[in-house]
């Protein structure tokens, strides 16, 4: 069982073997969760009924793909959904007041992983910047190196382009959807 929603990298699991305590395990959450589920199925008493529910961390916010998929789909431009520019003005309160807008609520540092902006004044108060740093701090040196090698050049290109308005929103969507489907690829593989 993962603590809360869990972490993508080196998450903490609770099990019978850990006497109810959470223990950090090295690896990617999707792989570890699947491995634990398979282990349970292989070791269970085949004469007894059972129920196993497998709930992965992916694809929950902040959509951190496994290192082996960080560059997957990088040269693909995903189509924009028909509702991409919907402002929800004619929708019910629940839809209209939600805080899941790519334009207004998707953060550059935590959600979109532009680590280079975390010390810039405009972004220091961004929602869950501490959560982003905690995610990075969980990584092994090898995981962190892979992460930097993949994201840093793309982030620097983004910063240099200084996108605004519709161009910025489209960039946010492409970064988000690519990371989202990269996370889903890990689930598909497991």
Located regions from the model:
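A Trp-anchored, charged/polar loop motif used as the substrate-binding/catalytic surface
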Residues: 29-43
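Active-site-proximal cap/lid insertion segments
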Residues: 2-27, 42-47, 53-190
